[in-house]
Amino acid sequence: MSAPLASLSHYKRIVIKIGSALLVDRGAGLKHAWLDAVCDDIAALRAKGVEVLVVSSGAIALGRTVLNLPGGALKLEESQAAAAVGQIALARHWSESLSRSSIVAGQILLTLGDTEERRRYLNARATISQLLKLGAVPIINENDTVATTEIRYGDNDRLAARVATMTGADLLILLSDIDGLYTAPPHLDPEAKLLPVIAEITPEIEAMAGGAASELSRGGMRTKIDAGKIATSAGCAMIITSGKLLNPLRGIDEGAAHSWFAPSAMPVTARKTWIAGQLQPAGILSVDAGAETALRAGKSLLPAGVREVSGHFHRGDTISVVGLEGREIARGLAGYDADEARRIAGHKSAEIEALLGYAGRSAMIHRDDLVMTEQTGRKAGKSTKKKDEAHA
């Protein structure tokens, strides 16, 4: 396992995710002093040669304040209207605050398809790369004016992880309302301990993550752990820390409490990073023990090892592979449509032509199109006792 670097200035490219509750106060609106302090931190990092990208929540929260919408859950059309108003205000505030340090901000609004569809993914990556090359700071958010319940990231933690892997960042920082991952909710358990270093996201670590989220923010510790799995598998370290300090990034360097998640020692290729990071696999293949062993040995997934096929997918779609314990172990690109996959599941590759009427591929998922998503072989450290949840 690699160790945390001594200073943020030792990283080359950092993605910073900022939640709505940190940026927006329900009664007073945008927290100007806090935003200015964060922008000062960003300017200090850039002065040391660090490239910085920001994934900023807050459009809906800011828009509902401007529009004086009532508290509680919003209808979809209300959220979209709030986002339309809030996005303009949010971008303006970021631009004005960064301009104090002569830094140009560039707004990018993404939808789920921009990271899930390969061509759009590459185009979005090229745009962000060009902004960085020109010296601008990309301010990224989900395009909530067009996103629907069915086609959305659902939270900016996972969006930030996708941006980090897309852009080849070596550190993702999630600013939260808590200073890291605890073994239990610290407000409920006086014995709860902060985990300063997480070597690997194991089932025990996942069990510590809760799903609580505030009214202003859709995310919780559960989504932060999901983000960590996406980022670390691509070789990107992750930090969860409190954003309540006026200068939270400077605070990390000055010793503020945080949890550091180690990047994988064997990050997957850029193409496999995209496959592994897909947020909505189109289907599921349940496999037997023999197939699971073969996949861990780097082999392709053959039809004989598939016990069950779920979902509706087409050849080339990303699908999830689930082992006997019901946990996802891999993801890959389907070699067959779902209906064909069901017909050949459990059969030998030599029988495919007789079953389908044509000689198709021998593998359900070829090893070149498959990436393991369940890490094995490393310990998570001493403080990995299973708890019900962690305060988010």
From Swiss-Prot:
Record's catalysed reaction(s): L-glutamate + ATP = L-glutamyl 5-phosphate + ADP
Pathway: Amino-acid biosynthesis; L-proline biosynthesis; L-glutamate 5-semialdehyde from L-glutamate: step 1/2
InterPro entries linked to this entry: AceGlu_kinase-like_sf, Asp/Glu/Uridylate_kinase, G5K_ProB, Glu/AcGlu_kinase, Glu_5kinase, Glu_5kinase/COase_Synthase, Glutamate_5-kinase_CS, PUA
GO MF: ATP binding; glutamate 5-kinase activity; RNA binding
Residue ranges of the region described as Disordered: 373-392
Boundaries of every PUA domain copy: 282-359
S-S pairs: none
UniProt cross-references to Pfam families, sorted A to Z: AA_kinase, PUA
Binding site for substrate: 57, 144, 156
Subcellular location: Cytoplasm
UniProt-annotated binding residues for ATP: 17, 176-177
Highest taxon of source: Bacteria
EC number in record: 2.7.2.11
One GO CC annotation: cytosol
Any one Gene Ontology BP term: L-proline biosynthetic process
Coiled coil: none
Broad enzyme group: transferase
Protein role: Catalyzes the transfer of a phosphate group to glutamate to form L-glutamate 5-phosphate.
Entry similarity comment: Belongs to the glutamate 5-kinase family.
Name this polypeptide is given: Glutamate 5-kinase
Organism annotation: Allorhizobium ampelinum (strain ATCC BAA-846 / DSM 112012 / S4)
The gene coding this protein: proB
